[in-house]
Amino acid sequence: MQTWDVIVIGGGHAGCDAAAASARLGARTLLLTHKLETIGEMSCNPAIGGLGKGHLVREIDALDGVMGRVADASGIQFRLLNRSKGPAVRGPRTQSDRALYRTAMQSELSGQANLEIRAAAIEDLMFEGERCVGAMDADGHAYHAVAVVLTTGTFLRGLIHKGAERIPAGRAGEAPSIGLSDTLYGLNLQMGRLKTGTPARLLKSTIDWDSLEQQAADDVPVPFSFMTDRIEVHQISCAVTRTTEATHKIIADNLGQSAVYSGAIAGRGPRYCPSIEDKVVRFADRSQHQIFLEPEGLDDDTVYPNGISTSLPDDVQQAFLETIPGLEQVVVKRYGYAIEYDYVDPRELDATLQLRKRAGLWLAGQINGTTGYEEAAAQGLVAGANAALFATGREPFVLSRSDAYIGVMIDDLITRGVSEPYRMFTSRAEYRLSLRADNADQRLTPKAMELGLASRGRGAVFCRKMEELSEARSLASNLSLTPNEARDKGLSVNADGKRRAVTELLAYPDVGWDRLVGIWPELGRVSPSVSEQIEIDALYAGYIDRQQADILAFRRDEAVRLPRDLDYSGIGGLSNEAREKLERARPETLGQAARIEGVTPGALTAVLAHVKRRTQGAS
């Protein structure tokens, strides 16, 4: 009987990074998916990154994950969002060529040592007592493993809705997974239904591009991967159009035919990616909504109209599309739809994304109530890495809220749960000045190297960068000016008699590296990427120093571990609400307990006192 260390079920974004992470750690890994040709498929929007999401991709890359490199190899319109704002909230994004992305992902995985890939429709999981030990396909073939990672996307009892149509499917043209859903319900897990949607796909040649506003790519593309020197894929523009009052009238007149508004869908959709029906109802005072017309590839005649996902019938979709400027003669290649699917309440998971009730089983991606490729891949990496560590007898790998956006997301999921699909924003991170996209490698690559998660090539590139950064910082710290000298050079600083080094001068808003090169030509030898890093560090230095005190306090609370078998019913001073929520979430640390809604400071004090008494009694 062949037994793998880790089996990953599902070849979407979570599954790809899960399988790659497991294999990089040396675990014998098997990736099982319905169809080999759909590995890395971009089921919805052909884009990677954005606000908050771009940070996740940088962090995935810093841990030597695959999404960033694949996005760089397939990106056809790179744009840095929030460029006019501070570096902490800037978000790298690209539209991808859908076919190039899929091909690049499959190439990455096929070249990964320790990874085998097979086509199989998995319908059941296998258990020995309370531990998951493998999976079984629809033909009854068993696959045995020490650890299993489940990344099912929207396939768990997936149901497509379009007007009055109901089509069982995981996505258009692919069968749902019924058996796996039944298995999970049989484990007595808290589960529910969520929904997401996608717009129609349009024929490129039938759009009046000349009449529309064009949005070009950035002149200098900003890659996702710290391993990418330059973007070599041809860059294109997309177009911008808007709905009209006529569009809104057609939609409003046909709301009863929308699956979302007819009551056919029970699951909640993503708040920050609403359907066009939702937009018309919720923002009734607005006469138009923006639509980005995004080509799906360099050699693809398909266009993705970003901003008008819908579950209206085909004829209504056609009618409202023809009222949109530039789309008056449009031909639809495939109409939009909503899809409803099962998910597991993520409070059933621990910080490694392993089920609390069943050892050896990890969940990642939309099955945990998230939305988005980036959120899925980040969870996949953490789940895959921890499954491999578990299978090979090593300590788990956990990222905290002060380490990474990945840590913020996982902590949000396992302590607060979800009532709607969760997506990442920079505003979710209380330490976002420290958790920037530009320093993701400095925060996380050393952890990946220590763990064995990073390749030798990644480690070598990182070490060279850090050497160059150290030399540049040393140079910058040894060059300084007095206020009088600064004034003579045209720099306006406080007249306090204090000498200021380059790093201190850079903290002034009107002082940049290029300006200082005019004073000290030797600074011109520093590479642009390193000088930019020093500028950003200087800009945030004062704020980060203050934030470090908050991080230290946070880590003190995170260091207080709460026993897994803690009986909250036996702790005096807890309200019924606090007791119920603590029992439900089973927080692993005092810090996690503090982030549960309804758990007051008084409740935390009572829990801490109880744990201390229990610890003292045991000793």
Swiss-Prot record:
FAD binds at G10, G11, G12, H13, A14, G15, I122, S177, Q366. It holds the Pfam family GIDA. It comes from the Bacteria. GO terms for cellular component: cytosol. SMART domains: GIDA_assoc_3. NAD(+) binds at residues 269-283. It is found in: Cytoplasm. GO terms for biological process: tRNA methylation; tRNA wobble uridine modification. InterPro entries: FAD/NAD-bd_sf, GIDA_C_N, MnmG, MnmG-rel, MnmG-rel_CS, MnmG_C, MnmG_C_subdom, MnmG_C_subdom_sf. Coiled coil: none annotated. Keywords: Cytoplasm, FAD, Flavoprotein, NAD, tRNA processing. GO terms for molecular function: flavin adenine dinucleotide binding. Its cofactor is FAD. Belongs to the MnmG family. Homodimer. Heterotetramer of two MnmE and two MnmG subunits. NAD-binding protein involved in the addition of a carboxymethylaminomethyl (cmnm) group at the wobble position (U34) of certain tRNAs, forming tRNA-cmnm(5)s(2)U34. This is tRNA uridine 5-carboxymethylaminomethyl modification enzyme MnmG. It comes from Maricaulis maris (strain MCS10). The lineage of its organism: Bacteria, Pseudomonadati, Pseudomonadota, Alphaproteobacteria, Maricaulales.
